[in-house]
Design a protein with these regions (language model features):
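C-terminal structural segments of small proteins and small subunits
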Residues: 84-108
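Short, hydrophobic-biased segments on the C-terminal half of alpha helices
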Residues: 57-58
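Short, intrinsically disordered, low-complexity terminal/loop segments
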Residues: 1-3, 116-117
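N-terminal helix-turn-helix DNA-binding core of bacterial DNA-binding proteins
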Residues: 2, 6, 10-49, 71-85, ...
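Short, charged, intrinsically disordered terminal tails
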Residues: 107-117
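Alpha-helical residues within the helix-turn-helix
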Residues: 44, 61-62, 67
Length: 117
């Protein structure tokens, strides 16, 4: 495996791990809908504490899905779509591979059915 493919694989892994948690998915939805938002504002919309929101945002940040920008005493978080785009490309390639395999199986099955007549 090349270093570039390994790097993409690690990026996809961290994104999928981050997205595995429903609270983190909710945070991404809120950030996508509202733009830059503080952890305090996000916590007001979720059934978790501000501290829990900050921990979830740290996981999302480590995966490259969000970024924080300090404005005075606050940190405002926003979605960073690049990591999600890379994951979507990986998933699309995986889906295309499975589509090709299923088409091959269908072709073999149809040929076997024709030959049995």
């Amino acid at each position: 495996m090349t270093d570039e493919r390994r790097d993409v694989g690690e990026e996809v892994d961290s994104v999928l791990v981050a997205l595995a948690d429903p609270t983190r998915r909710q945070l991404l939805d809120l950030l996508a809908a509202q733009g830059e938002v503080t952890a305090t504002r996000l916590a007001e919309r979720l059934p978790v504490s501000r501290q829990a929101v900050v921990k979830h945002l740290a996981v999302l940040d480590a995966a490259g899905l969000v970024s924080g920008r300090r404005v005075g005493r606050e940190v405002r978080y926003a979605v960073r779509p690049a990591a999600l785009d890379a994951t979507a490309r990986w998933m699309a390639a995986l889906a295309a591979d499975w589509d090709r395999r299923l088409a091959d199986i269908k072709r073999v099955a149809e040929a076997a059915e024709r030959d049995s007549r």
